[in-house]
């Protein structure tokens, strides 16, 4: 049980909380959507629960030319997807967009949670995992802010972007994230299903479809009789 629950409005408040708690040795537990299956959001030693969902969930910038969106880490998955689907109305965009990331916890998880757990989803075969979508991250840490570079590709390494992703709060509190987004083309969606005589044939067909250089399905499932 936390000693206090804080609901930040902006990045500056988070920075002050992190600095204060670091100085006074107070543990911080960042709460996004609460969908963790590893019990990582439980305040096992008291301290501060930093709840990002209620107020820290805004769009910071939308860039249609580069097809990117920058949001606060507390934004929920459904909120992000609806925002992108309504881009024409909200941002005066030329078309609708999608985030392309739909983990099993989509309805309850936050964008920040996707990044710090290095998540995957049912559409990752086509769009990639979350690390393939992240361009830039901003973190509040006890020693100051960490901002990764916003470039889609770099020749230098190690990649700070990839080091920070999957860290689950070990290096700081993720505040802002810039993601690639994708054009929403519902007219191109087709659904198919096939039945095979046995599991071995199904596996072979699946392997061939993934390796034949004919493009990837957005959602691809191979299931046995059970």
What is each stretch, according to the model?
Residues 30, 219-222:
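A structural preference for short, hydrophobic beta-strand core positions in alpha/beta folds
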Residues 58-220:
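FAD-binding subdomain of flavoenzyme oxidoreductases
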Residues 1-55:
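Glycine-rich N-terminal segment of FAD-binding domains in flavoprotein oxidoreductases
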Residues 37, 222-226:
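Short proline/glycine- and acidic-rich turn/helix-capping motifs at secondary-structure junctions
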């Amino acid at each position: 049980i936390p000693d206090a629950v804080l609901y930040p409005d902006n990045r500056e408040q988070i920075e002050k909380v992190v600095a204060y708690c670091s100085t006074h040795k107070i543990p911080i537990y960042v709460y996004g959507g609460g969908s963790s299956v590893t019990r990582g959001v439980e305040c096992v030693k008291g301290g501060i629960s930093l709840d990002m969902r209620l107020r820290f969930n805004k769009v910071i910038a939308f860039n249609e030319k580069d097809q990117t969106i920058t949001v606060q880490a507390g934004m929920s998955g459904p909120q992000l997807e609806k925002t992108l689907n309504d881009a024409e109305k909200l941002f005066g965009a030329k078309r609708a967009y999608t985030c392309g990331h739909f983990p099993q916890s989509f309805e309850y998880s936050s964008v920040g949670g996707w990044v710090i757990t290095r998540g995957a989803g049912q559409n990752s075969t086509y769009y990639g995992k979350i690390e393939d979508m992240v361009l830039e991250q901003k973190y509040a840490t006890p020693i100051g802010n960490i901002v990764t570079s916003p470039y889609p590709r770099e020749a230098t390494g190690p990649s700070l972007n990839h080091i920070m992703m999957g860290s689950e709060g070990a290096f700081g509190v993720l505040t802002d994230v810039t993601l690639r987004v994708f054009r929403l083309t519902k007219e191109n969606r087709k659904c198919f299903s096939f039945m095979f005589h046995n599991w071995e044939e199904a596996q072979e067909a699946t392997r061939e479809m993934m390796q034949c250089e004919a493009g990837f399905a957005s959602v691809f499932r191979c299931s046995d009789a059970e």
